[in-house]
């Protein structure tokens, strides 16, 4: 039995569930048949353990307040990183993962923006689950938004 940590920048404990949430929950449920699964994620709402979450051994939710999100987004812009990396960044979550990395055989990063939490000098296996990889959906959104809409430039 391997010990697996799932890292998500999306709140997997909130409802209603979206496609990305459902996908990683299905993956974790399947993996929990022969492995011990823990979860860390960013979120605002902390729900009590529901039936669809019972396959997680432990889960920890990190809250990021609005001012921290704005400051992190500014730092991301200055470092020429995607703005969403700053929006979904938690120093506490980064520290938690770094402190506990040696307890896990595998770390799965759910969504591309979660890869920023990859701990340095981690010797185990890592998996990047790319539900939100740049795809035709993003291309369709970019084409449908006006050039004058600032949201269009967040997708680049």
What are the residue ranges of the model-derived segments?
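Short, well-ordered alpha-helical microsegments
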Residues: 46-49, 111-118
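Short N-terminal targeting/anchoring amphipathic segment
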Residues: 97-115, 125-127
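Glycine/Thr-rich phosphate-binding loops of Rossmann-like dinucleotide-binding domains
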Residues: 14-15, 117, 136, 143
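A conserved catalytic-core segment of Leloir-type glycosyltransferases
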Residues: 39-95
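Acceptor-binding helix/loop patch of EC 2.4 sugar-transfer enzymes
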Residues: 66-83, 128-156
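Short, well-ordered beta-to-alpha junction loops that form the rim of enzyme active sites
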Residues: 9-10, 43, 109-113, 130-132
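N-terminal subdomain of nucleotide-sugar transferases
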Residues: 1-59, 102
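Short, conserved loop/helix-junction motifs that constitute active-site signature segments
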Residues: 119-123
């Amino acid at each position: 039995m391997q010990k697996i940590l799932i890292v998500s920048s999306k709140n997997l404990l909130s409802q209603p569930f979206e496609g990305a949430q459902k996908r990683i929950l299905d993956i974790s449920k399947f993996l929990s048949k022969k492995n011990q699964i823990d979860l860390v994620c960013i979120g605002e709402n902390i729900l009590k353990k529901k039936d669809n979450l019972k396959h997680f051994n432990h889960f920890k939710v990190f809250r990021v307040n609005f001012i921290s999100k704005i400051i992190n987004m500014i730092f991301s812009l200055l470092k020429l990183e995607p703005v969403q990396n700053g929006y979904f960044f938690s120093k506490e979550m980064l520290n938690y993962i770094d402190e506990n990395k040696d307890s896990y055989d595998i770390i799965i990063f759910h969504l591309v923006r979660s890869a920023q939490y990859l701990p340095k000098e981690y010797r185990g296996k890592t998996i990047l689950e790319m539900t939100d990889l740049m795809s035709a959906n993003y291309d369709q959104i970019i084409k449908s938004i006006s050039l004058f809409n600032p949201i269009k430039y967040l997708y680049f």
